[in-house]
A protein has these predicted regions:
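P-loop NTPase switch module centered on the Walker A-proximal segment
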Residues: 1-45, 54-57
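Residue-level signature of catalytic and energy-coupling elements of molecular machines
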Residues: 15, 36, 47, 58, ...
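Conserved Switch II/interswitch segment of TRAFAC-class P-loop GTPases
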Residues: 30-32, 37-43, 52-75, 79-104
Length: 428
């Protein structure tokens, strides 16, 4: 099976999955998109990418090895990503002589862990990818197994496809559609709910209210649109709306703010640098965000909350985020579109993490800015110079302190008042 879907030459040579391979097939009852994701730890980030849009997860376990750390990691991530339909496929049963005791022990071990992380139900199936046992047809070698085959289960399992349509209306604006002076519409993919002409809507975060004039698609105008459709909305009023804004019904708008707590899956070989600015992309919004040191890291095997100052590759932790301006968001449990985000390194433009918002954090209202009589201009006048801050940044050992010291010496020789703040001295 792996040789069928693994497309990269490196994957075929090593016998492992590195990238996410998408394959399509259909039976008489259903159409399927299979995302074959890597199981090796160093490619966990690829697994998160593939699982982020899945409705069902098939967790493969080698019958000879049982439940491993990576099995637990993937199961935790699957649950974290909101996938509630899980199949535990115990593979290579032919190599353990189709021993029921081996299968039962693996199911019991996995069930204990699944309960701890909140997985309420899963479907265990003994299979052999090489021999085809219990994949498309029942196997005589596992006559002790009374369940369905893998394909039969996939054909009949109930997938919640209507939940998005039943939630409050949300449409992140992707672009402003203005082909001529007589038309101005706002295009996007409806992430949840439904919308009709004449509905009262609010533009978030600005809070401007208006009504829907028309719903336009490539095939013509609609009177109603639902989650999953890409549409262009026109309004009866001239309101300020642009890419990154969210259109919602007036009676149920999403929250907006600049602080929240989120669970973070770190996907970069470079560790998290607390308080450094990262680009945060959520829906169609992109803002600058800083991250406080992790509240804790989650130990995959024990699920303990471990003390952590940073997050390394494949680590999972809980952090507090601050953005440079208010954004529109919801908890990941309520909206994958407005609750899931990625972090992008500002220097390399690499995606370094995926996050899921837990809840909003409110700033304390009893803390106010204290005005000072001696302001910046007064200090500058006293020193008879224009104040400036010079920040020297670079890799460790690159000579930042040496250059900063030389700059201060030259400024001092020019009669300028200076103060040198060195990071090593602060931490000493």
């Amino acid at each position: 099976f792996a040789l069928l879907v693994d497309g990269l030459a490196a994957e075929r040579e090593q016998g492992i999955t590195i990238d996410v391979a998408y394959r399509f097939f259909a039976t008489e009852k259903r159409k399927f998109i299979v995302a074959d994701t890597p199981g090796h730890e160093q490619y966990t980030r690829n697994m998160v990418t593939g699982a982020s849009t899945a409705d069902l997860a098939v967790i493969l376990v080698d019958a000879r090895q049982g439940v491993l750390t990576q099995t637990r990691r993937h199961s935790y991530l699957v649950h974290l990503l909101g996938i509630r339909q899980i199949v535990l496929a115990v593979n290579k049963m032919d190599l353990v002589n189709y021993n029921q005791a081996v299968f039962d022990q693996i199911v019991a071990d996995y069930g204990t862990f699944a309960t701890k992380i909140g997985i309420k139900d899963f479907t265990p199936i003994p299979i052999s990818g090489l021999a085809g046992d219990n994949i498309a047809s029942k196997s005589d070698a596992t006559n002790w197994y009374g369940g369905t085959t893998l394909i039969q289960h996939l054909e009949t399992v109930e997938v919640d496809t209507n939940s998005a349509a039943e939630k409050p209306f949300r449409m992140p604006v992707q672009w402003v559609n203005r082909p001529n002076l007589d038309f101005r519409g706002f295009s996007g993919l409806i992430s949840s709910g439904k919308i009709s002409t004449g509905d009262n809507v609010r533009i978030v975060p600005s809070g401007r209210n208006t009504t829907i004039k028309s719903i336009v698609t490539q095939d013509g105008k609609l009177s109603e649109a639902v989650a999953g459709q890409s549409v262009t909305l026109t309004f009866n009023d001239e309101v300020d709306c642009s890419r990154g804004d969210v259109v919602a019904l007036t009676e149920s708008p999403p929250a907006s703010g600049d602080r929240f707590e989120a669970t973070l899956v770190w996907m970069s070989e470079e560790p998290l640098v607390p308080r450094r600015g990262y680009w945060l992309k959520i829906g169609t919004q992109i803002v600058s965000a800083s991250i406080q040191p992790p509240k804790y890291q989650i130990g995959i095997n024990t699920l303990e909350h471990l003390a952590a100052k940073t997050l390394d590759l494949n680590a999972i932790g809980v952090c507090t985020f601050s953005t440079d301006k208010p954004i529109t968001f919801e908890s990941y449990a309520d909206s994958k579109t407005l609750g899931g985000f990625v972090l992008i390194d500002k220097m390399s433009n690499n995606t370094v993490a995926a996050g899921m918002i837990n809840f909003s954090l409110r700033r304390a209202h009893n803390i106010h800015w204290q005005a000072a009589d001696v302001d910046r201009e007064a200090h500058a006048s006293l020193k008879d110079q224009q104040p400036k801050v010079l920040w020297f940044t670079g890799l460790s050992g690159s000579g930042k302190s040496t250059i900063a010291n030389e700059v201060e010496k030259r400024l001092h020789a020019m009669g300028k008042h200076t103060f040198l703040l060195d990071g090593d001295n602060v931490r000493h």
